[in-house]
């Protein structure tokens, strides 16, 4: 799981700020829930107690920064010995991470024939064999699961249906982080998505490949998004995320889903004449995923910001969700089974009453935009409404 931390600092002193790949250990031990809390004296309002506590805090800070050098020589030698053992552990952990990455690459090659067969069935290039069908039915019986809504409403006929329509779009919409990126306009284009694949590079990193059938939105047959890890490992000898690169989408005329057309009125200050112009402004779309945020360079520290860090972390997490969730278990996301397993904690959202003052304040707010008027994007491929706000930018 990606850590909720700053991920764009590459300097050695800040390596711990970068997230680690989803399937690597975080390097921290589990909390000891059985441990007793430290006993702290009750703080009264008297100055005497406050001064005593202040003195204890000062001694702790002193021990943290300088106390080791003041310990007896024999104790310092033992600490040096522990550091030597820690170095041996770190070397082994570094070797483990490298071998784990190579193991992932090796098994990716073994998974490839399975995913290829899945792609053939989804796009309608081939039908599943009797053996494949029997194994799937046997797995359903072993799990003794209740039928999903899609299974309980089987439709008659459908013999002319090719493959599994909107397989990947449906699966993606069942993954929370991915569904939040998809706008109503995006669905028309994503319905032409026939496969999503992952491949590994020689250098640490992975590539996502999105294959599309011919469609009225863009000319690309395959769109890729590549995630790169840093060459040098972090303090825990795990791979650290560096940056991502995506393909440019070659949009067909008037079909760009990442922009919308806005009609604006302009007035000449001298002649007082007005004219109407149309400009394109960015809008939310899943396809912004292929134009990832760029981490600032090491020299450009001024461009660092919490907002950029959040965008970088979100972009990396989305890539991990494709890699670790959607691609390995696509059919379970399509049927909704994986979504049920995600809700393992048994908690559900509760209805919370809003503060009356907040509700009244919100109802009294007015939004005025006399200068701009959203116009129909006039996409030749569809006539859906403008997208709702989503996280991916």
UniProtKB/Swiss-Prot annotation:
Record-listed Phosphoserine modification sites: 16, 26, 59, 90
Compositionally biased region (Basic and acidic residues): 122-163
GO biological process, one term: transcription initiation-coupled chromatin remodeling
Domain of life where this protein originates: Eukaryota
Molecular-function GO terms, alphabetical: chromatin binding; H2A-H2B histone complex chaperone activity; histone binding
Record keyword NADP present: no
Composition bias type Polar residues, residue spans: 21-31, 382-393
Keywords, in A-Z order: Nucleus, Phosphoprotein
Main location: nucleus
PTM-bearing positions, type Phosphothreonine: 20, 24
InterPro entries for the chain: NAP-like_sf, NAP_family
Assigned GO CC terms: chromatin; cytosol; nucleus
SUPFAM superfamilies according to UniProt: NAP-like
Cellular compartments annotated: Nucleus
UniProt family annotation: Belongs to the nucleosome assembly protein (NAP) family.
Protein name stated in the entry: Putative nucleosome assembly protein C364.06
